[in-house]
Amino acid sequence: MASANRKNALFKVAALLEAMIILIMAVVFVGFIFIRGRNDAVTAAEEDPEVRTRPIIEKEETYYSLDGKKILMHDSTLGEVFVPVYSDVPVSDVDTEKIVTRNGYSFYMDGDTVKSKTGIDISEHQGEIDWGKVKGAGIDFAMIRAGYRTYGGGIVTIDENLSDNISSANAAGIDTGVYFFSQATTTDEAIEEADAVLDAISGCNVTYPVVYDWELIFDDSARTDDVSVETLADCCIAFCERVKSAGYTPMIYQNKTTAMHKLDLPRLKDYDFWLAEYGDEPTYYYKYDIWQYSSDGTVPGIEGRVDLNISFRDYGTGSPAPTSDEPA
């Protein structure tokens, strides 16, 4: 009888221990699931753009938001990405609410007066241009291609219609600037390009900037594929300083995405900037002086499509664009 009682007691202790072990295991398992769930939630909040950016999109209706030392940028190619904020690079002072579109052209307004200049950029590809009709359409300035370097062989070529376009545009009362499509990989090549441009426009009336247009080639392999951010900045500076030393206003042309990821903006902040960003209003964070807002414009006197631009400065006089009557 006593032996049976001892066995029963042992069974009860074993059962109690087993229950305690099961309870402990259950608590540990629940805790693990809870912690893992919290970690998953944090990961989702960090990696999922919808989770991270929803408050920004709903509350601010902007493509940019300051987050410490970074900007959240929405890009049509890259999606939503963080890019650095540079405290020493001037930010844009353009009030996008003052940009209006009339008859296919965009204007920067102050009440009922226009505070911008309307422009186009063209090359030999536009063929023969009736500059009188272009002026009659309300075009104030034209950025004319001076030339280009081939992205494969690296050959520098001057635009066939450069001189004729400058002189004919000037005769019609249109101010002119020029741009060079660069594929330079060294500062020596950038200086070579600048010298070619300066020689080509010698004796011409160029009052708008002389522009360095260095672009990435996406559809083919190019000699510039491995150009670093540092080397590109060196090339920009070499070209612009050469242009400045000749008495012209240097400028850098770039699209928003490449500007934010490929240009060393702190090193290039002192040069005027021509922004390419197509749409109803620009979203680029930093300062720009000319905005190319369309590659699909139509202008009387020019066959086919043409790029359209706003200049926030009147480079013809070296001052902010003067006011004029409200556009029709």
Predicted regions and their residues:
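A diffuse structural propensity rather than consistent per-protein peaks
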Residues: 72-74, 130, 159, 264
